[in-house]
Amino acid sequence: MPFKKLKYTCSILKVCLLAPFLVMPFIVCVAQIPGSEVNWPAFMARQNLKWDNLGKDYYSGIILGNGLLGTNIYKENDSLIRFDIGRSDVVDHREKLMPGAGKLYTQSRLPIGYFTLKTEGKITSAKIELDIYNAEAKGSISTTKGTISFTAFVAANQNVISVSLDAMQQEKVSGWEWNPGKSISPRYLQAYPTDKPANYPENPPVKMTIDNGYTFCNQPLLNNGGYTTAYQINGNASSGKLLVSVGYDGYNSLDETEEALNNLKNFNADKESIAAHRNWWHRYYQQSFVALPDKRMENFYWIQLYKLASITRADKPIADLMGPWTAATPWPAIWWNLNTQLTYSPIFTANHLELGESLFKSLNVHRQSLINNVPVQWRNDAAAIGRSSSYDLVSPITDAEISKGTFEPANLTWMLYYYYQYYTYTKDEQTLRTKIYPLLKRSANFLIHQLKQDEKGIYHFPMSHSPEYKNVEDANYTLSSLSWALQTLIKVNGEQQLKDADAGKWSLILKNLAAFPVGDTGFLIGKDVPLNSSHRHYSHLLMIYPYNLVNWEQPENKELISLSLKNWLMYKNALAGFSFSGAASIYAGMENGDMAYQWLNELFDRFMQPNTLYRESGPVIETPLAAATSIQEMLIQSWGDKIRIFPAIPSSWKDTSFKQLRAEGAFLVSADMQNGQTKNIRITSLKGGTLTLVSNMAKFSIRSDKRSKIDYQQYKEGEKIKIEIRKTIIGETLQLVSTSFEEKQAPAFPYSEYQNWFWGLNKK
C-alpha cells in the first residue's frame, strides 16, 4: 500500500514576551490531511447545525466567532431578531479607583451590546444552517409577511462581523437598532452574590456619533480607557449589509474608535477575501480527523473544534468562561481551579497546539503576576494563582488565607500539567527548559514551603481548601498535584541533564510525602474527611485523572479506583456537566467504553444546549470542551510512554476512524476499526525516539516509508499486544496493517446511532 504524502503549511507567529523573556517566533508546522483520504466538503456538511426556527436565548442561538470577536443570533420575541456582539478582551479597569473591591467587579468582562431587527410579520419558522466548515450561518427566516434570507460570518483574519439580509414578499423589517450593554460587571446585576461593593458606579454614559456613513458608540471607562462599537449599513435593513467592529483601549493608551474604524475601512468582502476566510477554517479542520458511528457524538466533537477556534487563537486572549459570546453571568473572569484546565484539554490530541499559545503566552508574559500572587517572603522562588483572575493573572493568595486554610494551593500546578503536555506532545525541549520547567519549579516551591514534617519524618500539607468542598489537611487535590510536580521535575532534571541543586530535596520529599488519604469509600477529600455529600468537582481524584499516578494498569489499584469513582458518583444532586465528562474520562482510563459512552450520552441528554453551549448560573465554556477530550480518550490515550489505540470503544461501535491525532512523544497517529477489529494503524514520528503501541490488533504487517527493515519487539499485555520500536526516524511514517484492511475515502461508513441528528433547533 503506497504512503500518502502530506502537505505541510507553516505559519510564523511572533510572540512578543515581556522581560526577562526574549521576542521569539513560535513556528507551527501542520500536516494537512489530503482530500484523497477525506472528502472534506461532504464530510463536514454532515456536521452542520440546523435551525427550523430561531432560538429564544443565548443557549439556542447561532454562534460565530474568530477568537476575539463574536456574535450570537436568536430572537427576543416573535417579531424581534437579536444579534449579540462580543469582544472577549473587553474588561473594566477600575482596580486602582476601587482598591477595596474584588476583581470580579473591578476587572470584569463587560458586555458590548446587541443589534435588533423588528420584523413586520410574526416569525413562524426558519431554515438556517451553521456551516462550521466555512464558519458561516446562512438561510432564511419565514414570517407571516414573507421571508428574510441572510448570511452572517465573523471574518477569520479581520475583526469584522458581516451580516447580509434580504427581505422578500410583503416582509419589511425596520432599521437596525443598536442597544449598548450596561457597562458594569455582570456579577453586580446578579441577585445572589454577597461580595458586592457598597458603592459601585456605572461607567460614564456612551457617546453616539455618525461620521461619513459610519456610526460609533463609544463607551468611556472610569479610568479613561474605553471601547467603541463601530458599524456601517450598506443598503437598507430590508436589503443590505451590516458590518460591525469593536475597538478597545483598556488603559487610555490607544484610540479605540480609530481601531474599530480602521477595521471596517480595511475590510474587504470580495471573493478573494471570502475565500481566505474559508480557507483558514479548512486548513484548521484538516489538521486532524475523527469519524464515529454515532452521529450526535461525531457532530458534537466537530462543533467543539469549531468553538475552540471561535473562542481563542494563538495571537488572541486566553479563553475565559464565555469566549466572545457575552451573557448575564456571575463569573465574568477566568477560573483556575478547573475551568481553564478543561477548556484547553482537547487541543493536544486534536493536533491544535497552536490554540494553546493563548494560554502559554499568558503564563509567560504575566509570570511576574504569578510570582506576586504569593506572599512576599516566598517570591524569590515560588509562584501561584488564586481561584479567578482577569487577563493579567493577578489573583493573590494572602498570608491570612494561608493561615485560615481557605485557599486553593494547587491551581497553578494543575494548569501547568497542561503546559507540560505541550512539551510531551511536541518534544520542544527549549520551551521545556526555559519556560515550563522554571515555572513548574516555582509552583512546586509554593507547595513545598508549606509542608510540615511529623515526628516520623512524613511531610504533610496543612489546612487548605479542596475546591467547592471543605478545608482539610492533606487535601488530595494538593498532594496529588505536588506528587505529580515532583515526579515531573525529577524526570525533566534527569533527562535534560540540568543538574538542579534541588533534585535531592525533591526526591526526599517525594519519598516521605504523606500518602493520599484513603478510607472505606476510596480516596477521601483529605485527612479524616470523606466525601459523604454530592460534589461536582473531581479534584480529590486528580491522582487518577488526569495525572494517572494511580491508574488502571496497576492491578493493586483497580479496586481503589472503582470504589472511589462509585462513591463520588453515588451522590447525584450536585453533579454538574463537567462531572459527567470527568466520569467518562475516568471510565475511559479504566478501558470501559460502555460506561464512558453512557456518561457522555447522559451529559448530552440532560445538560447540553441546542448550540452545544453549557449553562449553570451563567455560561461556562469548558464542559462541552472537556467532553470532546473524553471522546478523544475513548479513541486514543497516550501517557506513561505508551500510545493506546482504541482503548475504550463502546461495544456497540463496530466502525470508527481517526487521522492525525497527536500523541505524547510527538507522534501523529491514524487508525481504523472495521467491523469491531483494528485493521490499520499509521504513525508519523515528528521527533524520532521510541514508539510503544498498545492495541488489540491480532495479525498485521509493518512497513516504513524510510527503511525496508524495522526492528521491533512484540509483547502480550493482558488481552492486547504491546509493540515497541526503539528507534523511529524523524519524519518517518510507520504502518501496521491487516491483510483484510480496506482503505476508503471518508466518510467511509454509515452511522449506526442517531442517524438523523443535527445540533441546533430542529426535529430530530
Residue ranges and their predicted role:
Residues 322-334, 379-402, 458-477, 522-535, ...:
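Carbohydrate-binding/catalytic loop surfaces
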